[in-house]
Design a protein with these regions (language model features):
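Short, exposed beta-strand "edge-strand" segments with a Pro/Gly-rich flavor and a Y/T-containing core
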Residues: 51-55, 112-116, 126, 188-189
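C-terminal helical "tail/cap" subdomain of flavin- and related membrane-associated enzymes
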Residues: 129-210
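Detector for Asparagine
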Residues: 17, 22, 62, 108-109, ...
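Conserved FAD-binding catalytic core of PHBH/FMO-like flavoproteins
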Residues: 1-85
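Conserved mid-domain beta->alpha element of the FAD-binding
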Residues: 77, 83-160, 164
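Conserved flavin/dinucleotide-binding core of flavoenzymes
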Residues: 59-62, 66, 88-99, 210
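General N-terminal targeting signals
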Residues: 22-24, 40, 48-50, 57-59, ...
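Charge-rich, low-complexity amphipathic helices
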Residues: 27, 55, 83-87, 99, ...
Length: 210
């Protein structure tokens, strides 16, 4: 599970060069810092031995912000939320005339932002199948079966795989695998064609053609 702490404290005043989405990789404590319109959200993995009340306590909150900015007791939070992370894919994205898209069809950890984006791609793909059916230009059965096959395949081959890889990477910290991936990313950065292909895949544009 993740603990999400929301605060109006301007973290950028304490941590230079923050982006709107920041993944902090550390073997002792990894976390995510997200900027939303009026708040910063701090997402941290939780200790499974602690109760919900303990995880949402001032003690936990203070410790997290002590390590982030110092003087955690003075940091006010607007929300303290616990939520469970799943890696699941429905056996079928279709049940008769009912079609599943987004979180109804698949769940994954939030590292990389693939959940919402893949849901948008589901809807886009389904629209492409439904429009000709509704206009009488295509048969419903093969069209909906194709949607199910295409989107489940992409979910398994990319979204699930990539989010699991992201989780392993951020949890690993500065180990050998981390250094190897950093070296690989530098190679990608320095090659125009490789960089474009990588960005197309990460932006999930490649999956639209599958």
């Amino acid at each position: 599970r993740f603990l999400c702490l929301s605060t109006d404290l301007e973290l950028a005043d304490h941590l230079p060069n923050l982006a709107y989405v920041n993944y902090v990789s550390d073997p002792k404590e990894w976390l995510v810092l997200l900027r939303v319109p009026s708040l910063w959200r701090v997402l941290v993995p939780t200790d499974g031995s602690l109760s919900d009340d303990e995880l949402r306590s001032d003690k936990i909150k203070n410790g997290i912000f002590d390590r982030l900015v110092g003087d955690g007791a003075s940091v006010k939070t607007e929300h303290r939320t616990l939520y469970r992370v799943h890696q699941r894919v429905a056996k079928s994205f279709r049940e008769g005339r009912v079609m599943l898209v987004g979180d109804a069809a698949h769940l994954n950890n939030p590292l990389g932002g693939f959940g919402m984006n893949s849901g948008v791609h589901d809807a886009f793909n389904l629209f492409e199948k439904l429009e000709p059916v509704l206009k009488g230009k295509a048969q419903m059965e093969p069209s909906l079966a194709l949607y199910d096959r295409q989107r489940r395949e992409v979910t398994h081959s990319f979204t699930q795989m990539q989010t699991k890889e992201n989780m392993a990477f951020i949890k690993g910290g500065q180990d050998g695998a981390h250094e190897a991936r950093r070296a690989k990313m530098l190679e990608i950065k320095n090659n125009d064609e490789t960089r474009r292909n990588y960005l197309m895949r990460q932006a999930m544009f490649d999956s639209l053609a599958q």
